[in-house]
Amino acid sequence: MTDKFQAVVVGGGPGGYVCAIRLAQLGLKTACIESRGSLGGTCLNVGCIPSKSLLNLSEEFYKVQHLSNKGIEVGEVKLNLEKMMKSKDKAVTILTKGVEFLLKKNKVTYYKGIGSFKSQNEI
């Protein structure tokens, strides 16, 4: 690949993509390289966001189970883990695509792959 950039950010986590966007906003031709295949880092892809999504769904399940304490009777409530996981995955996808959109909007070139230095001026 022979594309030339004034700045290249290796890593598309919260530090990397924000840095890449800011560099582009300052007028530098910028690229961002992320090995995971989706932007946002650990928190967005496999940490905070997926965990909070599942915790929220679990809380909703708990609330529905205890509605009768407030005078609302419902039938049997069951967990469908497959649907819960799909809901969690959808939330993650929406947010990672949002980060990808921000890179495009700010004219940052996004590469899926591993970035390493070949020389002082070449990645």
Residue ranges: model-predicted function:
Residues 16-17:
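N-terminal Rossmann-fold NAD(P) dinucleotide-binding loop
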